[in-house]
Structure formats: structure tokens, C-alpha cells
Regions:
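Intrinsically disordered, metal-sensing/regulatory segments
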Residues: 1-262
Length: 262
């Protein structure tokens, strides 16, 4: 298979995962149970944390290994910038998380559906950045980042997006939308990922010396989403132990993917 074809497939895999998850509205009649939702939120958190550590932060430090103890600086700086960037977007963008009625960000007159879409966009942007930056490293021959490793990140994000797609589309169906509309809205939430990935690839190709910072930046952005959104939702109320089990499974799965394919 040509490298270009592999790149295209790798960039589209996360979107495919979101679409598969969104299609759950055609297979499930009732609203998603609290137990299943907690488990899936924990699983998604585990995949994102493992991808951030094994596929982003560690390669960022390994690329600067010749700097000795200072190799941690790009990873630390990029990580903090990634968290700060998402924090700024979170504060400025009006959005509404699924399962809540209290908007966040700047006040606006946007509809509930529009604010839900913005919340999902904020959530998915770091995942697209993560896929884009590892593919950029593989494309430009960066040390410690192979094409197989990039595919493993894309595959891991795609697997994680399956429950996310369901978590988005099922509540929309329960709110009274048709199955097709719920599926389309859930699927569209994943479009930002290949777009974000392409943007990062183009930027990284121009700024290869900054690649370690960009890897850590994507990791920081993903950690922000996990700590700010996923973990609070997964740990609130009953059945939080299921989210812990889901987290462990997701983390180990992504770790294995990175080691085996990387």
C-alpha cells in the first residue's frame, strides 16, 4: 500500500470511529444507561492519557535526549502551553456540555444544539492535533516516530471515538431528534479531527525544529480535556467504579498499541 494512501487512511480513521459510535442510535432503542456511559467515559479517558504519555510526551523528550537533563524542557513548556491554549478556548467559546443546562464560556444567544456542537469541537480538536503531529513527525523522518507509531495513535483515537460518538448521538436522540439527525450531528462532531490534523501537518512541516514542543502541546491539550471534562463526568454520581475500570482498560489498550505497532 502506498504511503500516501496510508496517510489518508490514518487521518480519516478517527472520523470513522466517531461515525461508528454515532450509528449506535440505529441499534439501541433507549437512552444509554448510566453504567455504560460511565464505562465509556473512563475508557476514552484512559486512551487519551496513554496516547499523551506514550505517543507524545515520551517521544518529545527522546527527540531531545542529546540535551541531557534539559530534554524535559520542550516537553514541559509544550505541555503547559497546550493546557493554556485549551483553557483560553474554553473560557472564550460559548459551549454546553452534554447532560448539563448551564452554558460555559462567553455569554451568547446561540441555540443549545450550536453550543453542544462547540463543546464537542473543543473536545475533538486536541485529538486531531495529536494525530496530525505524529503523522507530521513520521512524514519528515523524525527520530522515535515511525509511520507504524502514527497509525497506532490514529487507531487508538478511532477506537476511543466509538464510545464518544455514541455518547454524543444517544442523548440527542433521547432529546427528541430523529435517528438520522442524531447520527449526522454525532458524525459531524468528528469532522474537526482530520481538519485539525491536516492543519498541524502543514504547520509542522514548516517548523520541524519545534516538533518536540508541538508533540507536548497536543499532549497538554488532550490532558486538559480529560481533566476538565471526561473525568468529572465519569466520577460524578453512582457507578464511578465502572469508569475506573474503563480507564484502566483504555490505558492498557493504547499502551499495547503503541508498543506493539511503534
Amino acid at each position: 500500500m502506498k504511503v500516501t494512501t496510508i496517510f489518508i487512511i490514518g487521518l480519516l480513521l478517527p472520523l470513522l470511529g466517531t461515525m461508528i459510535g454515532s450509528a449506535f442510535v440505529f441499534m439501541m432503542k433507549n437512552e444509554m444507561s448510566a453504567r455504560l456511559q460511565k464505562s465509556l467515559l473512563g475508557f476514552a479517558s484512559g486512551v487519551m492519557v496513554a496516547a499523551s504519555v506514550w505517543s507524545l510526551l515520551i517521544p518529545a523528550m527522546e527527540m531531545k535526549a542529546n540535551s541531557g537533563a534539559w530534554s524535559v524542557v520542550p516537553a514541559a513548556v509544550g505541555f503547559l502551553l497546550g493546557i493554556g491554549f485549551l483553557l483560553l478556548i474554553d473560557e472564550l467559546t460559548p459551549h454546553l456540555h452534554i447532560g448539563t443546562d448551564k452554558p460555559e464560556g462567553l455569554r451568547s444567544h446561540l441555540s443549545k444544539t450550536a453550543m453542544l456542537a462547540l463543546a464537542v469541537t473543543i473536545h475533538n480538536l486536541p485529538e486531531g492535533m495529536a494525530v496530525g503531529v505524529v503523522f507530521a513527525g513520521a512524514e519528515n523522518g523524525a527520530a522515535h516516530i515511525s509511520l507504524a507509531a502514527a497509525i497506532s495513535v490514529s487507531l487508538g483515537i478511532a477506537i476511543q471515538n466509538i464510545p464518544e460518538g455514541a455518547i454524543i448521538s444517544m442523548p440527542m436522540r433521547a432529546a427528541g431528534n430523529s435517528r438520522w439527525k442524531s447520527f449526522m450531528l454525532g458524525s459531524l462532531s468528528g469532522v474537526v479531527e482530520p481538519i485539525g490534523a491536516l492543519a498541524v501537518i502543514l504547520l509542522a512541516s514548516l517548523l520541524m525544529p519545534a516538533l518536540p514542543y508541538m508533540l507536548a502541546f497536543a499532549a497538554g491539550a488532550m490532558f486538559y480535556v480529560v481533566v476538565e471534562e471526561l473525568i468529572p463526568e465519569a466520577s460524578s454520581g453512582q457507578h464511578s467504579n465502572l469508569s475506573t475500570i474503563g480507564f484502566a482498560i483504555g490505558f492498557v489498550l493504547m499502551m499495547v498499541l503503541d508498543v506493539v505497532m511503534g
